Regions:
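Alpha-helical transmembrane bundle of multi-pass membrane proteins
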Residues: 1-174
């Protein structure tokens, strides 16, 4: 779970900083904010309907598809209207993952250790995400999105080893 947190926070921070380096800053920033809102709204719902593995897998796949589209199509059309849409797809996937790991965290760890585990994963993942601004600002054009894509694929692959929850959380009919 700690590596999934690290991947998610790194990718989230990276895409936030990349939005400021694109030619169409304002449309990309607006699209990024909209994808955050939509991702946060549907993330918890996906988790309760599909479970942790499936919902995180689908969300990582959305972010991978968005990163592939930005890399292959978007950078050649950075001033076009299609570029903010592609950024939205990549950001939507990682926003959903971010919401799901917050909601799912108490179910993955036993209740006695959930707060300690949350603090530990936050500390380590925030340390790891500190390199994202340097990668976004100092790397050539495809490198940041390739790292986004690779780390999203790593997070999706690690879902195979994620246990379904041992902790407990209050559920409601949604």
């Amino acid at each position: 779970m700690i590596v999934i947190w690290m991947v998610t926070l790194y990718n989230y921070t990276l895409i936030q900083f990349l939005v400021n380096t694109f030619e169409s800053v304002y449309p990309s920033a607006i699209a990024s904010s909209i994808s955050d809102i939509v991702g946060y709204l549907i993330g918890g719902w996906l988790f309760y309907k599909l479970g942790i593995r499936v919902s995180l897998g689908v969300s990582f796949c959305v972010s991978i598809v968005g990163a592939i589209l930005v890399t292959l199509v978007g950078f050649r059309h950075e001033s076009s209207w299609i570029f903010p849409i592609l950024v939205t797809i990549a950001k939507l996937g990682i926003s959903i993952v971010y919401q799901i790991i917050y909601v799912a965290h108490p179910t993955v760890f036993p209740t006695l250790f959930a707060a300690t585990a949350f603090g530990l994963v936050q500390f380590v993942s925030n340390l790891f995400s500190m390199i994202a601004p340097a990668v976004a600002e100092n790397s050539e054009e495809p490198v940041p999105m390739l790292s986004f894509m690779f780390l999203s694929a790593l997070g999706a692959g690690l879902l195979l080893f994620l246990r379904e929850g041992t902790g407990s959380v209050a559920t409601s009919k949604f």
